[in-house]
Amino acid sequence: MENSNHLTESWSLSWQSVLSSQLWRLEHLYWIENKAGQLQRFSLNRAQRRLHERLWYRNDILKARQLGISTYVAMLMLDMSLFRSNFHCGIIDKTLVDGTGKIGKIELAYRSLDYVPDDPTEEDLALAELGRLIKGEIQA
């Protein structure tokens, strides 16, 4: 990137092509906190990918533990809120504490759109710049 303050036209066009893929956005733009309490880029696991491939307007998800489905749904809600116009979503959970935790995942992923990890690669820097631009568009 010659100028990190704005996207060049060709760079912008290349981002437009990848941003049109929801799966790409889910696996490249969003950061979550792992079990060790460290930030890591969200990457769909097998159960999440299977649900994503079969996603429909209404989905029944049987209760299961530790498959990451609530994390996937939280990232999907954030993604759809950012990239679809007039999209509204909400969380209904068993307790306020549980619901607040899920909203916290969304909040963290949004705040971390422009996160640069320690010892970043060129891709990390480019994705952080893209995240900064996305946040700038939302806040404008």
Show which residues each predicted segment covers.
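Phosphate/NTP-binding elements of NTP-utilizing enzymes
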Residues: E2-A140
